[in-house]
């Protein structure tokens, strides 16, 4: 189900977590896991096993935040959510590019 990812893919997870924390979208790793509808230990288990966060989990988080964005009328909240969604989408894109290079053997 999961393939071992290079260190730079796991570094993307850490950068994303820092970005989401700075935006105030998540308060902790446990909060990130909850928002992705995963168990509390999902992030740490994946990291300790040498994997990165699953793209499907990140896509679920984008869908959830998009729903919150559509329901919100607060300009600041909407800006924060748009920034978070953009950061997650950039992470997904970067992971896909890295995975593509792995398939090509580079």
State what each model feature region is.
Residues 32-33:
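Short alpha-helical "recognition helix" segments of helix-turn-helix
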Residues 2-24:
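A short, Lys/Arg-rich alpha-helix, primarily the initiator
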Residues 1-2, 106:
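Intrinsically disordered, low-complexity and often Lys/Arg-enriched segments
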